[in-house]
């Protein structure tokens, strides 16, 4: 069963001589419960696809179908600075009309699950970058969405913090059987996290290759299996860039 389906999707920004086509004729299926990493060079339209799936924008042509609801997590935590971690995580439930006691209990469980229990009463400026992203992950999970959309959520973090958050995300996704569409330009990150890696060409972005990830979990980003797959995918990306440069 498909959780996300894009058929012949194109997106153009602007009109006339200033028009820029970000993605062209994209076909993409994400199965329910699948973790798909969308990989490509900067500017290839990865974030555009995420915005289309999240219904933050509409395609110029083609169709986008999502089975259920979505939650979006960005590279920056986007936590409200005047709210505590607890209040930030409770907010989507409050907006959805969840009773106060229930949302407080659920938020507390989520905060503890991402190892922020002792920081629940802190505000974002009192947290490290990794802690803020943990809070953002808890808030995304609080929406109880069917599809989790992640736009380079760990791109600004140091390697050790990123690796820790990979473990935490992996545990949350497996426990909740979430469907994830994860945008990254980090090949090893994609091999570490994904069930499948989808490669996009330089702009206008097109899906050019798909790699299943048959590596048993739990995975380590420095494992030989991850390194071997990352090398194969990197070769594909290099070919895409060279082909684009040759015109």
Give short role names for the model-derived ranges:
Residues 137:
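Hydrophobic anchor residue at the start of the ABC signature
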Residues 123-127, 131:
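Conserved ABC ATPase signature
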Residues 83-90:
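Short coil-to-helix segment of the ABC ATPase nucleotide-binding domain corresponding to the Q-loop/switch region
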Residues 39-41:
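The feature captures the beta-strand-to-loop junction immediately N-terminal to the Walker
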Residues 54:
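Helix-to-loop junction immediately C-terminal to a conserved catalytic motif
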Residues 142-146:
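A short, proline-enriched helix->beta-strand linker immediately N-terminal to the Walker B motif
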């Amino acid at each position: 069963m498909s959780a996300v389906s894009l058929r012949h999707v194109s997106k153009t920004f602007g009109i006339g001589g200033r028009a820029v086509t970000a993605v062209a004729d994209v076909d993409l299926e994400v199965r329910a419960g699948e973790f798909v990493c969308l990989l490509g060079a900067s500017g290839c339209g990865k974030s555009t696809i995420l915005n289309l799936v999240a219904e933050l924008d509409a395609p110029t042509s083609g169709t986008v179908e999502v089975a259920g609801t979505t939650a979006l997590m960005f590279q920056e935590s986007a936590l409200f600075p005047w709210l505590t971690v607890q209040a930030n995580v409770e907010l989507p439930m409050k907006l959805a009309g969840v009773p106060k006691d229930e949302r407080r209990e659920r938020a507390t469980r989520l905060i503890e699950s991402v190892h922020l229990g002792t920081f629940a009463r802190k505000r974002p400026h009192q947290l490290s970058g990794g802690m803020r992203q943990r809070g953002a992950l808890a808030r995304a999970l609080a929406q109880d969405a069917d599809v989790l959309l992640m736009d380079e959520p760990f791109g600004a973090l140091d390697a050790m913090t990123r690796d820790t958050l990979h473990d935490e995300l992996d545990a949350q996704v497996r426990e909740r059987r979430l469907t994830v569409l994860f945008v990254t330009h980090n090949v090893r990150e994609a091999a570490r996290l994904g069930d499948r890696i989808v490669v996009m060409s330089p702009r206008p972005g097109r899906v050019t290759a798909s790699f299943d990830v048959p590596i048993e979990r739990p995975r380590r980003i420095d494992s030989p299996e991850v390194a071997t797959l990352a090398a194969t995918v990197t070769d594909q990306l290099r070919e895409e860039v060279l082909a684009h440069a040759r015109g």
